[in-house]
Amino acid sequence: MKIKIFNIILLFVLTLENCLSQGGNQELPEKYYLTELRGNISLDMEITDLKSNKGMINVLISDESKNEIASATFIKVKGLKAEVSFDSIHPGRYAIQFYHDENQNGKLDLNLIGIPKESYGSSNDVKPVLGPPKFEKMLFNLTENKKVIMVPVN
């Protein structure tokens, strides 16, 4: 199970790195889907209470199987919040994770003992306890159009 989560994170980081390296000084796309979404549900997200208006928000939506990433996006911060909508999602159980990449280096910066220096968060506002949030606690049912407001852990 840990290998699957590691592979998901690795794929996300490599995809972001690829976008950054190919684009040079070009702007990243506002949305970048890792898989083709063909459902009929919309998920609107608002991430509030950010520490600064610098950088980008990186969002990862995973299905309950953990090994298939539903979508990922790179969102500009406007004011101290960021908003994004995902269309065409299938009904199901999903988990959302995000981090605020303030310096736009394509990764969540950590201090010497592994604690994130940049803001991050997850669905259901699951807080980390001696490690990353438990995936099962982040899962939520998506059966109809939904708006999710998320506040980062600073």
Residue ranges and their predicted role:
Residues L80, S85, I89-R93:
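A glycine-anchored, Pro-Gly-centered beta-turn/N-cap motif
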Residues T73-K78:
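Short beta-strand segments within Ig-like beta-sandwich modules, predominantly Fibronectin type-III
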Residues E102-L110:
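Acidic, glycine-anchored loop motifs typical of Ca2+
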Residues M1-E27:
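Bacterial Sec-dependent N-terminal signal peptides
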Residues K66-A72, L130-P133:
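Short beta-strand and strand-turn-strand segments in soluble, beta-rich domains
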Residues Y94-F98:
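A short tyrosine-centered beta-strand micro-motif
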Residues L20-I57, I61, L110-N154:
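Primarily secretory-pathway and cell-envelope proteins
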